[in-house]
Regions:
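Short linear motifs embedded in intrinsically disordered, charge-biased segments
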Residues: 1-165
Length: 165
């Protein structure tokens, strides 16, 4: 890897570009992810974009055959994209479920009308219950959101955080 700014200034340039990455690109990628269902295919694409941005930031070409783990090590970063998306989704879900508004009805699937032919679309609530895992059903998740302290503790446990946010 050739350094565009050789010497002691290279670390400052890397720090600056990593802060730009974390502030601007992640915000653009995570915009509106709270209310969308993330499929396995979309999850893989988001992780690929995250790695592509890190490679661009460090000026590592695909031709150099540097593994993703080495790129993460050089950048001093971790794969945080999906964890951040899931955290946002769970916070959004808990917030919406404690209110009696239209968003609540949409997320719980209580919308009138006929469903189209074919395979049912994956619901947001089902994908969230699948992510949380264990014996948590969509109905169980809705019940747990009523107690804010219990919900925050569960979110922290599922995401592996040390303290609830």
């Amino acid at each position: 890897m050739k350094q565009p700014f050789p010497g002691k200034h290279w670390n400052k340039v890397t720090e600056c570009t990593s802060s730009i990455y974390s502030e601007l690109h992640r915000i653009a990628l995570l915009y509106g992810c709270e209310a969308s269902t993330i499929s396995k295919k979309l999850e893989e694409k988001l992780e690929a974009v995250e790695m592509w941005l890190l490679r661009r930031m460090l000026r590592i070409s695909w031709v150099e055959r540097v593994t993703n783990e080495q790129v993460l090590q050089r950048a001093g970063a971790k794969r945080e994209m999906m964890k951040s998306i899931r955290r946002r989704q769970m916070r959004f879900f808990g917030h919406v479920m404690r209110q009696e508004q239209l968003e609540n009805l949409c997320l719980t699937g209580k919308v009138e009308g006929k469903r189209g032919r074919g395979r049912p679309r994956t619901k947001f609530l089902d994908s969230l219950a699948k992510f949380v895992g264990g014996a948590n059903t969509p109905a169980g998740l809705i019940r747990k959101t009523a107690d804010r302290a219990e919900w925050r503790l569960m979110v922290a446990n599922v995401l592996g955080d040390t303290a609830p946010r």
